[in-house]
Amino acid sequence: MVEKVLSRSVRLIFAGGMVVGAAVQPALADDVQKVEITGSSLKRVDAETALPVQVVTKAEIAKTGVTSTQDLLATISAVSAGGSTTNAAGAGNSTGGLSSISLRGIGDSRTLVLVNGRRLAPFASGGGTVVNVNSIPLAAIERVEVLKDGASGIYGSDAMAGVVNFILTKNYEGVELSGGLGTPTASGGGQNGHASIVAGFNSDSGLSGVVSASYEQDKVLFGRDRSYAKSANNPPYYGSGATGQGNIQGPWTPGGGDDQATGGSGWGNPLAASGQCNTIGMTLYPGLSSKKQKYCAYDSGPDVGLLPDRKLINLTGSLTYKLNANAELFAEGLYSQSKVTTTYQASPARSDFFDPDVLFDGTATQKGTDRALLIYPNNPAYQSIAVPYLQSIGKSSFIGQPLAITARVQDFGPRQNVDTADQYRFIVGTRGTIANQDYEVAYATNQSKLNSAVTTGYFSQFAYAKAINDPNSNWNPWAPGGVQNPALAAQIQAAKFSGDYLSATSKSDTFDAKISGDAFKLGDSTSQYAVGLQSTRQNYALNPSSAYLNGDIAGLGGTVVPLDRSRNINSIFAELNVPIAKTLDGNLSVRSDRYNDVGNTTNYKANLRWQPVKEVLLRTSYGTGFRAPTLNDLWYPQSKGTSGQFDDNGPHGTGQTGIQIGNEITGGNPNLKPEKSKQFSMGAVLQPSSNFSVGADFFRIRISDYISTPTEQEIVDGYRRGDPAYQGLVTVDASNNIMSIIATTQNAGTADVQGVDLFVNFRQSLKDYGKLEINLNGTQMLKFDQTSPGGQLFNKVGTLVNNINGTNTAVIGANNGGVILRWKHMLSGTWTYGNWATTLVQNYASGYQTKDRMDGQPNFVGASQIYDLNLAYKGIKNAVFSVGVKNLFDKQPDTFIPVSNQFQSGYDIYQYDPRGRFVYVNATYKFK
């Protein structure tokens, strides 16, 4: 069989999907063999598919200069920041080391991640919802196949947006050593180092195997190391509203409760009134409190990590034993351990943050202290500082009463979390051929385990409050530098907390079997079929320490309750490929999944591939999909805790920003339904000549019963604009301050996503001057419309806000990842001359609108063009050396204003690498 020109072309297109210039040669006729392509259960000659699959090879990965699997995926145009999690996101708000992928921006839980065609256990952090892509070793990746189309008809749940399949090295003989170092050219942290070994063998006895081991390390980078991130205050763009030291919440009756106590800014701060916030390490907030007073806020910018300290160890192995020409046994193993240390600002403390802490339950007499930090009239600081201030703002009626005060507790230093995540997968099975039918049977066991600990910056709220609230403590919240008297300082230190506070485990055990082969003849052509079954048991367990269970550890966000739930999933699937005519193929797949907790679902996919002439390929597909709610979505017990930050500066709001409250109800919902989707795509591939090809694919994804946990900002915005769906989720006090929020998981509206993927590939021999390759891969988002639970429509392409009733309101989902870019592409050119190869890459991202500035004016981030350069040399036998620069011209970020929930300041953590210009050297040597 001789491949047609277009078949070779499409192989080049797929294999060069990124593309960064690796020369991918078409196979000769004798090399053609049937393989399984992501998106199908059938084995066929590669590239004979109606589905848009992009393939990134090992050689191409080397030319990008990426240092992690997360960074590699970010170069793919179909991958969106929307709905994903990154290392940078975890640096300022611990995610346990999770890095995830979101195709089309519809969320990482709607993109299926596979390794060698099978699932990994979801990451134990964040509810066991998504796969941590950094547990997949970059050094062991042979290629990445990205199916840019829904595939629930083949794979079941989660494949709404598409599938990312990591194929690890399997057939290798010899030993390969590689390593590299990289550093930003700017001072500070952010350095990277990595080393790996891959070894493989093939024996005459039929036994073959490959093992790999790798180590990666990233150094921490802080906000103080970058000019654009060193402060959370940058008027008129943004200002820090984080809880400051010494703000007066209001009078407090000991043993009773608050009289006129408010949130974190309420009646202002004596030092703010005199312009002396800096004496206690705070800053003057550029606005007024809900009580129209000046107050001090905490500038978290310098202390927040932009990138965490990360250490990653990966081990992989595969073993195959040929029983005979038609059967073999196989085994695969994967182990990964990541240790991520995140460091950020000191913990805040105030009365509403103590609300979830069960140690304060009961009266103060019963428990020994009040649910607030109090300063008493007999305190010298009360008389010398508080009294004159209260008189000056017309609140002499407060004098003589204890006052509730806010604190930014510097006594224990900055907060530091250490998250250790272990992931393993082990597979055993057999495959072969019986009567010309291919079969495969396998058992896989998967586990992701997370252990979270704290080292500094954390303390028992109850013990701290008890020390402060001693009427004889003489606590001075306005003391210069925060220095307290020695006796009180010693008592405070006894409240320190360190050690493990949470462990979580996500497990799955799966048995699967399938058979495929030729079905029946249609003229001169043969149809193909595949049928199979799968049985999976999933388990998710969450085990907090007693202190975390009580909600008593300051800075961890309130109570976390135990969870241990399991479920069974049984599935059957089938696929049929029919050659309808000489140039027209049709494919139909169907899968039925039975869950013992959310019911049954059946999904299908149909596609057509038409090649009227050898230079033209037309393709289209239509299918349905679903996503089952996770065990955490369904069963996580509802509990009260501290909210994330949000703003209340819209119509009918208080005007405050950076608010946190201590009375937020979160948790699962056992009444959730599975999400449903419908997907459609159609595209064309053209190759007018052997060295030029171009293609485009239109896609549309419609999702109903969208599962989400609305953010505080979404809820507050909906409540303030009068959306009926949010009115029961918020309570306010007599002064209109938000006092409580209910943010449980729900089926919340719909989404309609449309766009076009485009690629162009060109290769040209320069004769005596080598050869030139130019490749473009881009994605144009045409539409991303999502409705809120109340039916409010949000248009999300190119913006984080929509104008609703004259006010720019955060789009739904804006807090859960980054913006949906209108256009994103990677354009690369490689010139190869002798033993040298030079690659220049342009990474382009269109501009977008952010949250409004503090003065109410709109803010925009401009289009970004970041260039990377790589120079490789292979003139030494079995060795390759490369040097490179990422962000060649050291482009600095435009000023970014987040909707909320981003501790880092000044830049978009999902779009910009704060390392800036980054230089690296890599080397690889093969022993054969």
Question: Can you say where each PLM-predicted feature lies in the sequence?
Answer:
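Short acidic/polar hinge/loop motifs at secondary-structure boundaries
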Residues: 118-148
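N-terminal periplasmic accessory domains that precede
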Residues: 69-72, 99-102, 132-134, 158-179, ...
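Surface-exposed, low-complexity loop segments enriched in small/polar and acidic residues
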Residues: 128, 227-234, 274-310, 316, ...
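Short loop/turn motifs that connect adjacent beta-strands in outer-membrane beta-barrel proteins
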Residues: 171-174, 204-206, 324-327, 433-438, ...
